Design a protein with these regions (language model features):
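Conserved FAD-binding catalytic core of PHBH/FMO-like flavoproteins
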Residues: 4, 11-105, 111-114
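FAD/FMN-dependent oxidoreductases across multiple families
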Residues: 87-168, 174-178
Length: 241
């Protein structure tokens, strides 16, 4: 039997950040930067009261705690390639020691689902070709220091849904419409601003003996402003636009 060729109004590629299909279909340039770092992620089970996300800045790199349900949180720790290569075999015990210091506890914590992946910045300048769209990490990969990568993806999905619904409500086809062009125009600016902004934030928090005292004095003054946390939280949750 001959295979029938299937034609779709819209094809969305969510194939992770390293798929070869992107290079075959989309030949646009992108903003790239290799941080020479590794992100270590894992799940932590505990019996403590942890309700809010928090970030800690260590000499090895920033460590984030992200609660996702009762008695569980995700951990994301960004470290240099050299540190990871030297300590990979003992990383569980190192994480446990760090957490007990951070949480000021001697209680038992369970570490599971430990993973690692290279950290780099990549912001695609081309989002679509004809009726084919990239979505997810293939579109933008940013440093995990601010925990904004997943939020950007969620906002991309929300905007795409709105544009598709608008076309359908007007009785218009999705194929050969302006849906993907409008998606690019509405999301590219924010994705680029966040990606570059997070890159600058990461550079700011890098250890620098000549700048550290001034840097932390500046941070101490900033956090005194009551509206500062409100503004940063709003931007993190809702975006700029």
């Amino acid at each position: 039997l001959k295979k029938k060729r299937k034609i779709y109004d819209l094809v969305i590629l969510c194939l992770g950040r390293e798929s070869e299909h992107y290079k075959k279909i989309f030949k646009g340039k992108s903003i790239k930067k290799d941080y020479n770092e590794v992100a270590i992620t894992c799940h932590i089970k505990h019996n403590l009261k942890i309700n809010a996300a928090s970030q800690y800045f260590y000499e090895e790199g920033p460590l984030a705690i992200l609660p996702f349900k009762n008695s569980f949180f995700s951990l994301v720790w960004s470290v240099s390639n050299n540190f990871f290569e030297k300590n990979n075999l003992n990383i569980r015990s190192i994480i446990e020691k760090k957490l007990k210091t951070i949480l000021k506890t001697t209680s038992k914590i369970k570490i599971s689902n430990v993973k690692s992946f290279p950290i780099y910045l990549r912001l695609s300048k081309k989002y679509h070709k004809q009726n084919c769209l990239i979505l997810g990490e293939g579109l933008h990969t940013i440093h995990p220091i601010a925990g904004q990568g997943f939020n950007l993806i969620l906002r991309d999905i929300k905007k795409l849904k709105e544009l598709i619904k608008k076309n359908i409500d007007l009785g218009l086809n999705i194929k050969n419409s302006f849906v993907l062009k409008n998606f690019y125009n509405s999301r590219n600016a924010e994705n680029t601003i966040f990606g570059v902004g997070v890159d600058i934030t990461n550079s700011f928090f890098k250890k620098n003996k000549h700048f550290d005292r001034t840097k932390f004095a500046l941070l101490d003054n900033i956090v005194k402003y009551k509206n500062f946390k409100k503004i940063t939280k709003y931007i993190s949750d809702k975006g700029f636009f």
